[in-house]
């Protein structure tokens, strides 16, 4: 019941070219790196695949759940075939978009993690996901730090 494959990708809405508009070209390298990570993840022989990312609360969404980029100006629906209201938070919607960009992949579900979840809660959640099947893969979506260099916002802190 181990996690046998994982990829970590960023989830800024600007990774979606239609949302980045004029800056789309500036993010080509980021999209290519995410594509490479997803491709490696999809080659793993697994029994379950989850997309994990920050959310307002810790909640599991079914694989059929959809998301939409309309709050960011693009009425693009992503994720599962559920025709109900799109409810995936941004992080999971970007994960769904990346998987669709890679040609689609069967997933077991989406797992939102409360931003204020502590280490013990995250470890327990990880154990629960790992126990979901004999071989588990995780696509983990996260925010990057703005403090990446001296010229970055807050870089001198």
Regions found by a protein language model. Name each.
Residues 1-87:
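A short aromatic-anchored loop/beta-hairpin motif
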Residues 79-125:
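Cap/lid and interdomain-hinge subdomains that line or gate substrate/regulatory clefts
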């Amino acid at each position: 019941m181990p996690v046998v494959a994982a990829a970590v990708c960023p989830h800024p809405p600007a990774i979606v070219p239609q949302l980045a508009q004029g800056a789309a070209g500036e993010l080509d390298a980021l999209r290519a790196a995410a594509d490479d990570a997803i491709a490696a993840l999809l080659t793993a022989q697994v029994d379950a695949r989850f997309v994990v990312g920050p959310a307002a609360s810790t909640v599991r969404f079914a694989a059929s759940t959809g998301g939409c980029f309309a709050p960011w100006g693009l009425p693009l629906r992503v994720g599962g075939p559920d025709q109900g209201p799109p409810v995936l938070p941004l992080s999971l919607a970007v994960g769904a978009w990346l998987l669709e960009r890679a040609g689609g992949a069967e997933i077991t579900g989406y797992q939102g993690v409360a931003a204020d979840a502590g280490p013990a809660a995250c470890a327990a959640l990880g154990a629960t996901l790992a126990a979901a099947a004999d071989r588990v893969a995780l696509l983990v979506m996260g925010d990057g730090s703005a403090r990446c260099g001296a010229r970055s916002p807050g870089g001198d802190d």
